[in-house]
Design a protein with these regions (language model features):
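Catalytic-site neighborhoods of secreted/periplasmic enzymes
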Residues: 1-100
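Short, solvent-exposed turn/loop segments enriched in Gly/Ser/Thr/Pro and often Arg
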Residues: 2-13, 131-136, 161-169, 227-232, ...
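Polar, surface-exposed loop/tail segments
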Residues: 5-17, 93-111, 115, 221-226, ...
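C-terminal cap/loop subdomain of S1 sulfatases and analogous C-terminal strand-loop tails that border
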Residues: 14, 24, 28-35, 45, ...
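Short glycine/proline-rich turn/loop motifs
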Residues: 87-101, 174-194, 260-267
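A long, amphipathic alpha-helix that forms part
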Residues: 105-121, 182-223, 288
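Active-site His/acidic residue clusters
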Residues: 115-160, 176-191, 234
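Histidine-centered active-site microenvironments of extracellular/periplasmic hydrolases
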Residues: 138-144, 148, 212-270, 274-277, ...
Length: 308
């Protein structure tokens, strides 16, 4: 079940062209990319592209944030000194707090929806893909997370003058991208990265809230938890923005696994530097649940031998 962000859009017509009934069980799952959506969060769009009926937009309006696109106007916009609305799409505004209260922000909201799903599942087995949109641009954090960190907390960028003077032609092209040019400037990094760090801290806090909820529901000791990300962000390292190439900043993402079974006690709390991939996660979960990963359909390898 999906709660949160996905880049995949349901496509009924494609399923029909494949000769599959889009309303069949297989067709529904395929056009939802294998998910049963509990709540889809397909990302924030500028006003011209906004769907006013998104569940999060409806929720914000119910809390008094009146707008055709409350997500954009409140969750990802700040208020200037003269009451003007400052867009989170402009990096210079990352130092301001979002107009939305923290308890109604994207991260808090999706954590609540995840807990709703777990609570509603009762004693039935469940599998949840909780996908947070933050930390991600628009770089706009709600108070108090917008100013928990200062420019002095920002680490020096991992880049060299040689990289800038003599880049590979492909990297040279990416260095000309607007984001790369922006993050090449120290002033931009010192404005954006503290907000980015605040958004990471907010994720930490709400995951802590979710862990306590699982404990209260009696499910901490029978739930495998996998924490990871789809990619990193250069934020100025190697004179780049975004996440397009193969440096560690882009592809070396976190992977933390909580395996509550006694077989994992020997490795609990340890770190492993061997390279694994996202495609290894589905075989890992299948084997942990007692199944046999179908090798003719799955490319990855189970990570249980590293955990047990």
């Amino acid at each position: 079940v999906l709660a949160g962000k996905t880049h995949m859009a349901a496509d009924r017509e494609t399923i029909q062209r494949l000769g599959i009934d889009p309303d069949s069980r297989a067709g529904v799952l395929m056009r939802q990319c294998g998910f049963e959506p509990h709540e889809r969060d397909d990302g924030l769009h500028p006003a011209a592209l906004a769907d006013p009926d998104l569940a999060y937009n409806r929720y914000l309006r119910e809390q008094g944030y009146e707008s055709d696109n409350s997500w954009n106007e409140f969750a990802n916009s700040a208020e200037g000194p003269n009451g003007e609305v400052l867009s989170g799409w402009c990096m210079r505004n990352a130092k301001f707090a979002a107009r939305v209260q923290e308890e109604h922000s994207e991260t808090a909201y999706m954590t609540n929806r995840a807990m709703d799903f777990i609570r509603d599942s009762g004693n039935k087995p469940w599998c949840l893909h909780l996908s947070y949109i933050k930390p991600h641009w628009p770089y706009m954090a709600p108070a108090p997370y917008h100013d928990l960190y200062a420019p002095e907390d920002v680490q020096a960028p991992n880049r060299s003058e040689r990289e800038r003077r003599d880049p590979h032609p492909v990297r040279s092209a990416f260095m000309q991208h607007e984001d790369s040019k922006n993050f090449a400037r120290d002033a931009v990094r010192e404005t954006v990265i503290p907000a980015y760090m605040g958004l990471v801290k907010q994720i930490d806090d709400h995951l802590g809230r979710l862990w306590k909820f699982l404990e209260a529901q009696g499910q901490w000791e029978n739930t495998m938890i996998v924490f990871t990300s789809d990619h990193g962000d250069y934020l100025g390292d190697h004179w780049l923005g975004e996440k397009d190439l193969f440096h560690d900043e882009s592809v070396r993402i976190p992977l933390l696994i909580h395996d509550p079974s006694p077989q994992a006690d020997a490795t609990r709390g340890t770190r492993d530097s061997r390279m694994v991939e996202g495609i290894d996660l589905v075989p890992t979960v299948i084997e942990w649940l007692g199944g046999t990963p179908p090798e003719h359909r799955l490319e990855g390898a189970s990570l249980l031998p590293l955990l047990h």
